[in-house]
């Protein structure tokens, strides 16, 4: 990656001037301290305090992802940031207004340097910055490198996780890139969000959402695509007596999860080992001063 492009992308990521009301940036909904998730509201808020339908997802290890957004609407990271920039609810800008601003701003004239000030170069710079969001320094990673040994509780939780959760949240990413699944949540009648089907147009994709990574999940509350669950304990309890219908990508059929109260505590203990403190506190991810 080009360090100058990464620096430009970082500047763009945190610039509120790229929103129509001058108050919203990418970093406003994606905080580096929470693995680039949005913890202030169940669903993201954009310009003029407009409320979206979904929770802003965490951003990490994006180089290994093949689709972006909860519904997989974007297929390439270089294009992803264009969606929030131009969405009416989020940043509400037009391509022309963005380009005019960048070309007339002395700071961006310097930041682009010899590169053409263009939308493709802007998008590529943001993507280059986001590609640096690599999380690999958790207690789980140290265990895998044989640098630490799990406690008995963490080990029990790990075994339970592998048996019950790993089919969707597979190691080492703790997600399943390119896979969309239903976890059985009832649709919020006010949001009327049909998930993947809104992109594919296929009835069988109704209420399917991208399987998110669970790395740093301790920090990425609230949970689910619409932020309806506040704690990991609540999430694990929801899944603890559940029969899930697996999508074809995961082999189809049913997946039955049964966890008692003690086992739920063990699973949460394991999930806490996925927290990467260095990632959450990395100064190179934070807003430039």
Model regions and ranges:
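Periplasmic c-type cytochrome electron-transfer domains
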Residues: 1-289
């Amino acid at each position: 990656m080009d360090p100058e492009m990464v620096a430009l992308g970082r500047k763009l990521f945190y610039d509120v001037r790229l929103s129509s009301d001058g108050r919203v940036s990418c970093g406003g909904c994606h905080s580096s301290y929470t693995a680039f998730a949005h913890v202030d509201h169940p669903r993201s808020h954009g310009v003029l305090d407009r409320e979206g339908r979904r929770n802003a997802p965490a951003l990490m290890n994006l180089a290994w992802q093949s689709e972006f957004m909860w519904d997989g609407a974007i297929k390439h990271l270089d294009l992803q940031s264009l969606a929030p920039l131009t969405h009416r609810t989020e940043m509400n800008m037009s391509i022309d207004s963005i380009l005019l601003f960048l070309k007339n701003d002395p700071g961006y004239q310097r930041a682009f340097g010899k590169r053409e000030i263009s939308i493709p170069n802007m998008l590529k710079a943001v993507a280059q910055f986001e590609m640096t969001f690599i999380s690999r320094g958790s207690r789980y990673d140290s265990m895998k490198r044989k640098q630490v040994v799990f406690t008995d509780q963490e080990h029990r939780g790990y075994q339970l996780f592998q048996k019950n959760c790993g089919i969707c949240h597979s190691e080492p990413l703790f997600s399943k890139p390119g896979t969309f699944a239903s976890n059985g949540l009832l649709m919020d009648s006010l949001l009327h969000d049909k998930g993947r089907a809104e992109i594919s147009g296929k009835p069988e994709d109704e209420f399917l959402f991208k399987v998110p990574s669970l790395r740093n999940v301790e920090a990425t509350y609230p949970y689910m695509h619409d932020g309806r669950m506040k704690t990991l304990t609540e999430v694990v309890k929801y899944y603890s007596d559940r029969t899930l219908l697996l999508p074809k990508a995961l082999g189809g059929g049913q997946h039955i999860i049964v966890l008692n109260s003690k086992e739920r505590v063990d699973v949460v203990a394991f999930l806490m080992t996925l927290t990467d403190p260095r990632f959450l506190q990395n100064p190179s991810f934070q807003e430039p001063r």
